[in-house]
Structure formats: structure tokens, C-alpha cells
């Protein structure tokens, strides 16, 4: 069984570790590794994680026994924090968990990030009329479409509108339709006659008693929350509450 990281030193190559400490212009202040399947609770993956931990601490012990100071050690990222007991390390790398998610809705975390935009305008289409690039949306009946001021240039996956993406407006779920544009997208607000320009639309977060979680968006796009949240662009205004 091999335990090789993307960029690090093979754990069994103690000589390479020693040579790093002997570099004149390098001051090592810490040693770390990364658990590649800490998000999985299958028996096979739990065993793999256990062996990774054992190998890591073996390398740390070797350094200490041979007079090399490993400094601060760390190996747990968010999933490792949630799925493993506390480790004898100096740090834990809580990344995605700081947003209140780590990939599973049932992990007990409370989301702290919301993504909202506004309605630019509302258009009424007659039955048979089309809207958007490629004329991708066709109104089967008289339909009210709200145009939202957010698009794929802000980091949203373009596939979201094609895979059942939703928003919350006035506490009600509204389906995304047509093709997402660079700066805008359409949602069907036919049943919400009071929706008008300036209304807030929630893509991630709560509106009234309903909620849209980033895990749902990720599942619809065939990806993970980490990717979606890291894609959110600098064009978005950030409000810290």
C-alpha cells in the first residue's frame, strides 16, 4: 500500500526528510500531511485513513528521535475534524467547515454563508414565446419571468439552470429556466404576482421558513460544495453580519 502525497516526501523516505532539515537556508517550522478519504466512513476508507495517521506519526516520531524538531504538526482538515477523534497535533485546518458545511447536510453544522441577488425586471411571455440564448425557454402558457442580476461570471455553474436549479423569492421556491447568461438568469415567478424589480432572490440561504443549501446546488451540478463556494467571484458584494 502506497502513501504518497501530491507534493510531499514519501513517508518511508526518512533520508529525504533529514536532508530537508540540513538545508542551510531553510527553516522548518512544521510538518503536515493530508487525509485523502477522511470524508468517507466505509470500512475500507476508514482503514486507509488509520494507516495514513499511523505512517504520519511514525515519521514525526523518527524526526524527534533523530534530533529534528518537527515544529507544529497538523493533518486534519474539515472532514478529518468531523469524522475523527482529536489528534495530538498543533493545528487543525478547518476550511469548508467554517462556512457551516462539509459536504453532508446531516453533519450538524449550521450554514453561515448566504448568496443573494435582486430581481432586475419581470417580463410576461405569451404562450409559445421564447426567451434567452438558443431560445432555450419556451412558455407553455402565459408566464412571468424574473430576470436576476447574477450569472456564470459570478461563479455559478452554467449547468445549474439546466438541472433544476431553484431560488427563493418572497419565501417561495422559483425554478430557474432557460440558459444562464454571463450576468443574468431567468426564474419562473408565474405564481407570485407581487414579485417586482428590486426584490431579493436567495440562491443559498434562508428566506422565511424555507432554505436552499449549497449541498443541493452542488448535487444538481455534479460537484461538491467546496468547488461552488471557491468559485464565487470578486464581483459579488460581501456583507459580514
Model-identified regions with their sequence ranges:
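Active-site loop/helix belt of alpha/beta enzymes
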Residues: 3-126, 193
Amino acid at each position: 500500500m502506497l502513501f504518497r502525497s501530491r507534493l510531499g516526501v514519501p513517508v518511508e523516505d526518512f533520508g529525504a526528510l533529514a536532508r530537508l532539515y540540513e538545508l542551510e537556508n531553510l527553516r522548518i517550522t512544521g510538518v503536515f500531511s493530508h487525509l485523502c478519504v477522511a470524508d468517507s466512513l466505509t470500512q475500507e476508507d476508514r482503514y486507509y485513513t488509520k494507516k495514513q495517521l499511523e505512517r504520519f506519526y511514525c515519521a514525526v516520531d523518527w524526526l524527534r528521535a533523530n534530533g529534528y524538531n518537527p515544529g507544529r504538526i497538523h493533518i486534519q482538515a474539515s472532514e478529518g475534524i468531523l469524522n475523527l477523534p482529536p489528534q495530538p497535533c498543533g493545528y487543525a485546518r478547518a476550511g469548508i467547515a467554517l462556512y457551516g458545511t462539509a459536504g453532508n447536510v446531516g453533519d450538524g453544522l449550521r450554514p453561515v454563508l448566504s448568496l443573494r441577488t435582486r430581481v432586475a425586471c419581470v417580463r410576461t411571455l405569451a404562450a409559445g414565446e421564447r426567451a434567452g440564448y438558443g431560445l432555450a425557454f419556451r412558455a407553455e402558457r402565459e408566464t412571468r419571468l424574473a430576470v436576476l442580476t447574477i450569472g456564470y461570471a459570478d461563479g455559478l455553474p452554467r449547468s445549474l439552470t439546466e438541472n433544476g436549479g431553484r431560488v427563493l423569492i418572497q419565501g417561495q421556491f422559483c425554478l430557474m429556466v432557460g440558459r444562464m447568461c454571463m450576468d443574468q438568469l431567468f426564474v419562473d415567478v408565474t405564481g407570485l404576482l407581487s414579485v417586482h424589480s428590486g426584490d431579493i432572490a436567495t440562491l443559498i440561504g434562508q428566506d422565511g421558513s424555507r432554505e436552499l443549501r449549497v449541498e443541493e446546488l452542488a448535487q444538481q451540478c455534479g460537484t461538491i460544495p467546496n468547488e461552488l463556494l471557491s468559485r464565487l467571484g470578486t464581483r459579488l458584494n460581501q456583507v459580514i453580519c
